[in-house]
């Protein structure tokens, strides 16, 4: 009888421990954590009603704790629902966090962190070479050879610093989506306009006929938060679903931060929903496995190459890199008109996002596009990095 009681106590303790959510810690030493801000992810299968009940309960707990202890925490900030992957972002005191972790409906919690663009501005007069390179097996051509469908009927979401949707390079194909970064819908940085011009600009872009949606998740200094990125991804999936374009959409994320399971899960859900997702590998010349969303297995992770088919000195590398694309000295549009030159894996990723849209426009399934691009790619990159592919983006033009 004593043994049975002991066993019962042990099993009860084990069940309680098993019910507690995991608090995930990001492993990259350079991660910039945002104090008292957390991303909470619910377990698969939690219904909408149970999710709303949990949200209401947390709001009540936070309100009580705030009144009792006089904290300056702000409570619930954003909710996420990406194809039934549910969660939220909030600013909570430690006691409220403990209550959240003890809820059996919660899968895991991670601290929010700073996310930044993956681009570096360089001289403004450098020549454009990326388009010619991705349409020829051999380096050196300035001609861009492509199918004239050029992404027609496909929508690309630019998740970035915003986009100057009135720039002449977009010819009326760009529209505003949402802003999770600040209250200013303009692209004050220029990064988002440049990347959009690269994936779908009339003069500088790969998919010259694709539609463009501005999703602003980074501010004028090029930084944002993981929670803001997830909110932007959430918008993209819901917008594509409402417009009936899942399967005819792509997304570019020329940004990154330390490893984040929530960020990786969000982009994975978007990819699985029918949106081709291209992401920058990062600019620290390190293993991209330590970065998000670059480390998400489901997305197409892009490293940067030079005009000489070498790895760009800044580019991250590693086994999670799917493909290389031009990223050094890339000329494209700037806000207000005209063009400028930037370098970074931020410039490489939109080449792949645009090429994904190009392939989707010709009938490819977004879920299979990255594999198709890797099959087409040219084995051209010298010194690609340890355990890293040497495959360079190619559009299959036959040139």
Curated annotation (Swiss-Prot):
Function: Secreted subtilisin-like serine protease with keratinolytic activity that contributes to pathogenicity.
Protein name listed in UniProt: Subtilisin-like protease 4
Residue intervals passing through the bilayer: none
GO molecular function, a single term: serine-type endopeptidase activity
Record domain Peptidase S8: where: 128-399
GO BP annotation list: proteolysis
A Pfam family hit: Peptidase_S8
Main location: secreted
Residue span(s) of the pro-peptide: 20-118
GO cellular component: extracellular region
PANTHER family, per the entry: CEREVISIN-RELATED, PEPTIDASE S8
SUPFAM superfamilies: Protease propeptides/inhibitors, Subtilisin-like
Record key words, sorted: Glycoprotein, Hydrolase, Protease, Secreted, Serine protease, Signal, Virulence, Zymogen
Enzyme Commission number(s) from the entry: 3.4.21.-
CDD domains per record: Peptidases_S8_PCSK9_ProteinaseK_like
Inhibitor I9 domain location: 38-117
Broad EC category: hydrolase
